[in-house]
Amino acid sequence: MTALYGHDAAVAAFRESFDAGTLHHAWLLSGPQGIGKALFAEKAALRVLAEGQGRVAAPGLDVPDDHPAAKLVAAGSHPDLMRLERLPRESNPAELARSITVDQVRGLSRLFGTTASMSPWRVVIVDSADDLERAAANALLKNLEEPPPHSLFLLVSHAPERLLPTIRSRCRLLRLSPLVPDAMTSALREALPEASDAEIAELVAAAPGSPGRALAFQGLDIAALDKAMGELAREGDPTNARRSALAQSLALKSAQPRYEAFLTRAPSLVAAEARRRSGRALDDALRTWERAQSLAASARGLSLDPESVVFELAGLLASLAPASASR
């Protein structure tokens, strides 16, 4: 299994609870997208299942690849582990369903309706809890309120504040932070062994703290996208020509990965500009950043029209330009 970088404190907190025999039955793993929350959940689940078969002599959450539990988890066939995640659409298997359904959550009865097969533990990974439809969230809550013995729920969430308060209250919150540059470099170097130092450095800069997003940006010519956004922020767009062109180009179905990159990069560029300002100009930039963050989050969560989103976000970038540039 891939190594976990940059989350030593979170690993230590989980291990301390597990080793003391006080492991909480539900953990809410929170933090920005792409920093390794799902990988943490996978490794924590595997470690608990493996330890249930006997002591594992490996540090942190590591389990040797030749361990029986590791082989089963890697094959997706461990009988004591279930994952709740968005499934491929029946109408178009190339796309994922919009949410995790209540029927999927009810399927946990297959896991908890029998005794554990290989260890005392039965583990559920929810990736992500943000994707639960309302009925599914309520069904999961019932399991969290009355957990079966030796059950462990690992809920991944990019926006825990949007979850049902009752779900949050049943979980122990474990915050995972964005990776520092050295950890980012190590994670990307493992994932992209053939990449040059310059390519790794460009990806680190393109998605600070988030190796998952950095990998998604690979091959998208992020430098060109940043150049277009930078020109908007420096020179403005008095005729709307620049943002119209950008919106049309990123709205194409083939441009979906670049659109996703834009949703990440645009608020980051506004934040970078805010850090260079002071006084009233700083206040204005911070308000612009808040609007950009909110719009990008809504675009992801509500599947807003990409062309309209890009046009509006590009307008926020253009509003950062000096007044003289907009004439």
Task: List each language-model region with its residue ranges.
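Flexible beta-alpha connector loops of hexameric P-loop NTPases
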Residues: 91-102, 129, 173
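Conserved catalytic/switch belt of AAA+ P-loop NTPases
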Residues: 113, 138-152
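Conserved Walker B
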Residues: 128-132, 144, 160
